[in-house]
Amino acid sequence: DRVYIHPF
Protein backbone atom coordinates (compact mmCIF):
# COMPACT_ATOMS: atom_id res chain seq x y z
CA ASP A 1 0.00 0.00 0.00
CA ARG A 2 0.94 3.62 -0.48
CA VAL A 3 2.35 5.31 2.65
CA TYR A 4 2.19 8.85 1.23
CA ILE A 5 0.05 9.86 -1.73
CA HIS A 6 1.76 12.97 -3.05
CA PRO A 7 -0.24 15.52 -5.13
CA PHE A 8 2.25 15.35 -8.05
Swiss-Prot record:
Keywords: Vasoactive, Vasoconstrictor. It comes from the Eukaryota. GO terms for biological process: vasoconstriction. Belongs to the serpin family. This is Angiotensin-like peptide 2. It comes from Bothrops jararaca (Jararaca).
